[in-house]
């Protein structure tokens, strides 16, 4: 199912659903960041997705990283909360989401890289190369906040 992301766009459709989601900035021992090229919009993104009713938010991030990349991770911190109502995601099935995302930091504790049906490519990216990848504004913001090494998480 394809999707289109909107940010501060007066032509964006109105949301008909709110989804609580979690994402994770997963780094390797060289400080590179794990990204996936999404099949549904061909943009690079952090691993992440919607919370199940039986999940905690950190558990959601751990599960989504495993499902989307094959890696087992441990949550190590919090990048921030992202609840901007100007960010809307429209799916081809008619769902238009306003997303509530909590972004964590995580370290790899096992598994091996394996592309899921949600992505076409997985890559560990050195921070200076992030700007060269096609990526939605909201993903760039999470990465920027991570790279700033903030004393406190972003709350927005």
Indicate where each model-derived feature is located.
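A short coil-to-beta-strand element that immediately follows conserved catalytic motifs
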Residues: 72-81
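Short connector loops at helix/strand junctions that flank enzyme active sites
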Residues: 19, 39-41, 46, 73, ...
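Short, well-ordered beta-strand micro-motif
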Residues: 26, 103-107, 124
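Acidic, metal-coordinating catalytic segment for phosphate/diphosphate chemistry
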Residues: 1-23
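Active-site-adjacent beta-strand/loop module that shapes the phosphate/pyrophosphate-binding cleft
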Residues: 84-112
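Conserved Nudix-box catalytic region and its N-terminal flanking loop in Nudix hydrolases
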Residues: 28, 32-68
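Nudix hydrolase/Nudix homology domain
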Residues: 42-43, 112-156
